[in-house]
């Protein structure tokens, strides 16, 4: 054994050839600060070996290196800029020394090689991969950019266009694509990986492969003519501006850095990467996006722990076809759980099957599946007008009309047709689960399962625990949601549960602004362009459906009369009374026409101004700051109340529900991350200016306490140790 660290070791393989093996405790390898330091020590040992002829890098895990240790990021990002820069220089010196070894090097890459894992193998001369490879640089999705030389080496290896596509979008690619663009040199079966890598290494040692020529381009300026460079970088900057926008500085910073570094050799180019990385790491956007990643891991870990003792349902059923039922049936079947889809009429069943077939055809068109797979999936969805096969199902989700009487009747009837251990769930969006449970003989086997539309796209499923829902019932429903590829978050019961309960105060803020003379077009523009929502409130209401919102608004007002009962006729009432139901009938706040692809495109409609004039004061202008404050305060206050009342268990789960269920702007990180970034005292000062607008603007006492004591909602993070300690971690 030449060297043994906590996460990697170095040993001789055969005469003159050494192997460096990543083998961290636990299931995966991460390129954390300790591993970077250990890698430097191992390379130091190699540099002393006069008889070294070649080096093989490999992993003892199912994946090569999954990336940097993101749990370290928040503390690293608190280190002063100068110290963070010093540490990056140290880390890059390690990869430079790997790249500069006076012998050929090869990485045998299996599974994931992401972020720092990808940057590590870019420093070797050759890369051989297994078919399950996923390799790439996802850093821009975390609000940063590659920091271990990825933005320097990848463009010089692949050319600017392919590298920019991966780096700016934070993409990873599979084995075939990696081979096509030159990111790996070959792909072999897993059992042949080391043997194949050794064969390449021996060819390089014997002079049959010119490893020095392979290495040289990574040390030099990027080989691009002035015209090629102008075209590549202009197109890349245009694409980034269009897709990422101003709220995500990392992608455009990465592109500009690669452009600026193109005319320099490795050392100067790495210095530019360092100078760009450090300021990004100190942005609120990076903290928010890293926070989302960590919250996502927490939520998924919680679901995994919850379901460890239950079996995933093997057969499911959906009550109520149509678009929603068809979407749920498709998602279940697509992920391998056969489903019976029941409705009371053929027309709805046809609509549900058409929806499932349409979604499968999209997968076929994209080349994700072939005709055989399509037929196989669709054959596991069984449409029926009766209860045939219900005695075999493990779980049933009801997705009929949002009416408590209808839902109770359907659930009670279904309970008599299934096994005593079958779980029943309701896809209600607002009706309290404990109220629906009153109709059942086995309420312990019942809970809520709130999907979001469109089901195949929206990652969140709210799992609602009723007063009598058993732990086993919740666990089984969470297991099914996870199997469907969704992110389940368990919440406690109340009208609207969590997501809709906090959404309707946001809509109430919108209605009050319109009542006071604001223009809905400006509100949409401000909330989209300035705050960052994917849709402004008027557009969102049109997508949800004005009729749906009108009904849900009444349910929420009955559930929370002190805050959500209104004493005036609002814009939603006016549009509902005029039969303007939004996208579903082409008329809402906006008018909708289908574009060439059959998608609804919004247009202005002067008629709506006359309708709104009946429920509004004369038009007046509002500042962007006032619009944002009046829209967000009611939502944030309600989010805080939900945490204080135990409707949602943690700030992390609340923020993920908002991001995954409502599209809360990820660069803000969710309501609690936004509050912590803004500061609770500053938020309180802002909210107090609008208390005269009513109970929705009254800040909860718990938040007032946070402001008094200057306490955040997320646990405070300590800065990482000084850079000198990091080096020898």
Curated annotation (Swiss-Prot):
Record pathway: Lipid metabolism; fatty acid beta-oxidation
Encoding gene, per UniProt annotation: fadB
Function text: Involved in the aerobic and anaerobic degradation of long-chain fatty acids via beta-oxidation cycle. Catalyzes the formation of 3-oxoacyl-CoA from enoyl-CoA via L-3-hydroxyacyl-CoA. It can also use D-3-hydroxyacyl-CoA and cis-3-enoyl-CoA as substrate.
Subunit structure: Heterotetramer of two alpha chains (FadB) and two beta chains (FadA).
Region spans: Enoyl-CoA hydratase/isomerase: 1-189
Region (Disordered): 708-729
Annotated family: In the N-terminal section; belongs to the enoyl-CoA hydratase/isomerase family. In the C-terminal section; belongs to the 3-hydroxyacyl-CoA dehydrogenase family.
Amino-acid positions noted as binding substrate in the UniProt annotation, renumbered to this chain: 296, 500, 660
Keyword annotations from UniProtKB, A to Z: Fatty acid metabolism, Isomerase, Lipid degradation, Lipid metabolism, Lyase, Multifunctional enzyme, NAD, Oxidoreductase
Alphabetical list of Pfam families matching this protein: 3HCDH, 3HCDH_N, ECH_1
GO BP term (any one): fatty acid beta-oxidation
Coiled coil: none
A GO cellular-component term linked to this record: fatty acid beta-oxidation multienzyme complex
Descriptive protein name: Fatty acid oxidation complex subunit alpha
Catalytic activity: a (3S)-3-hydroxyacyl-CoA + NAD(+) = a 3-oxoacyl-CoA + NADH + H(+); a (3S)-3-hydroxyacyl-CoA = a (2E)-enoyl-CoA + H2O; a 4-saturated-(3S)-3-hydroxyacyl-CoA = a (3E)-enoyl-CoA + H2O; (3S)-3-hydroxybutanoyl-CoA = (3R)-3-hydroxybutanoyl-CoA
Chain residue ranges for the region called 3-hydroxyacyl-CoA dehydrogenase: 311-729
Residues annotated as catalytic: 450 (for 3-hydroxyacyl-coa dehydrogenase activity)
């Amino acid at each position: 054994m030449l060297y043994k660290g906590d996460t990697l070791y170095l040993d001789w393989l055969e005469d003159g050839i050494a192997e460096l093996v990543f083998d961290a405790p636990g299931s995966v390898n991460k390129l954390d600060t300790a591993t970077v330091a250990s890698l430097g020590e191992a390379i130091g040992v190699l540099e002393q070996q006069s008889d070294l002829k070649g080096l093989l890098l490999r992993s003892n895990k199912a994946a090569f290196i999954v990336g940097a240790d993101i749990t370290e990021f928040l503390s690293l990002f608190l280190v002063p800029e100068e110290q963070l820069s010093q540490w990056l220089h140290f880390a890059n010196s390690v990869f430079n020394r790997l790249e500069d070894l006076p012998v050929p090097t090869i990485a045998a890459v299996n599974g994931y090689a992401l972020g720092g894992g990808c940057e590590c193998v870019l420093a070797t001369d050759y890369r051989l991969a297994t078919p399950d490879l996923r390799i790439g640089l996802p850093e821009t999705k975390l609000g940063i950019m590659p920091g271990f030389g990825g933005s320097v080496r990848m463009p010089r290896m692949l050319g600017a266009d392919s590298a920019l596509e991966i780096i700016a979008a934070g993409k990873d690619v599979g084995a075939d694509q990696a081979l096509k663009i030159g990111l790996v040199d070959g792909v072999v079966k897993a059992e042949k990986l080391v043997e194949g890598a050794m064969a390449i290494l021996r060819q390089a040692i014997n002079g049959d492969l010119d490893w020095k020529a392979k290495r040289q381009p990574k040390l030099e300026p990027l080989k691009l003519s002035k015209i090629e460079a102008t075209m590549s970088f202009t197109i890349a900057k245009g694409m980034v501006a269009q897709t990422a926008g101003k709220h995500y500085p990392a992608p455009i910073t990465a592109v500009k850095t690669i452009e600026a570094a193109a005319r320099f050799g490795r050392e100067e180019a790495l210095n530019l990467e360092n100078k760009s990385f450090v300021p990004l790491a100190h942005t609120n956007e990076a903290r928010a996006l890293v926070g989302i990643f960590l919250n996502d891991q927490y939520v998924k870990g919680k679901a995994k722990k919850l379901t460890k003792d239950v079996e995933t349902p093997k057969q499911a059923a959906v009550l109520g076809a149509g678009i929603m039922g068809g979407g749920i049936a498709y998602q279940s079947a697509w992920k391998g759980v056969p489903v019976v889809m029941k409705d009371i009429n053929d027309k709805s069943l046809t609509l549900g099957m058409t929806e499932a077939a349409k979604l499968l055809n999209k997968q076929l068109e994209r080349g994700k599946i072939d005709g055989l797979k399509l037929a196989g999936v669709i054959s596991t969805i069984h449409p029926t007008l009766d209860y045939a096969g219900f005695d075999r199902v493990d779980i049933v989700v009801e997705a009929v009309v949002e009416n408590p009487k209808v839902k109770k009747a359907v659930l009670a009837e279904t309970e008599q047709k299934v096994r005593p251990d079958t779980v029943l769930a309701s896809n209600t969006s607002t009706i309290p689960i404990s109220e629906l449970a009153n109709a059942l003989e086995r309420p312990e086997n019942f809970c809520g399962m709130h999907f979001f539309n469109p089901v195949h796209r929206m990652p969140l499923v709210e799992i609602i625990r009723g007063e009598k829902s058993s732990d086993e019932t919740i666990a089984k429903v969470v297991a099914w949601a996870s199997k469907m590829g969704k992110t389940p978050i368990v919440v406690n019961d109340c009208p609207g549960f969590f997501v809709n309960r906090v959404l309707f105060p946001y809509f109430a803020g919108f209605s009050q602004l319109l009542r006071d003379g604001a223009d809905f077009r400006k509100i949409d523009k401000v909330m989209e362009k300035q705050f960052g929502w994917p849709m402004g409130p008027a557009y969102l209401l049109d997508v949800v459906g004005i009729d749906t919102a009108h009904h849900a608004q009444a349910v929420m007002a009955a559930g929370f009369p002190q805050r959500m009962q209104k004493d005036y006729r609002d814009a939603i009432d006016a549009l509902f009374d005029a039969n303007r139901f939004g996208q579903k009938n082409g008329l809402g706040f906006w008018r909708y026409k289908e574009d060439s692809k059959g998608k609804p495109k919004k247009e202005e409609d002067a008629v709506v101004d006359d309708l709104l004039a009946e429920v509004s004061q004369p038009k007046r202008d509002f500042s962007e700051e006032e619009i944002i404050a009046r829209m967000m305060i009611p939502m944030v206050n309600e989010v805080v109340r939900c945490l204080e009342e135990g409707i949602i268990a943690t700030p992390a789960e609340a923020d993920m529900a908002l991001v995954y269920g409502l599209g809360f702007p990820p660069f803000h990180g969710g309501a609690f991350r936004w509050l912590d970034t803004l500061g609770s005292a500053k938020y309180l000062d802002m909210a107090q200016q609008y208390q005269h607008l009513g109970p929705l603007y009254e800040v909860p006492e718990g938040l007032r306490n946070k402001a008094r004591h200057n306490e955040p909602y997320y646990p405070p993070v300590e800065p990482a140790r000084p850079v000198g300690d990091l080096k020898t971690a």
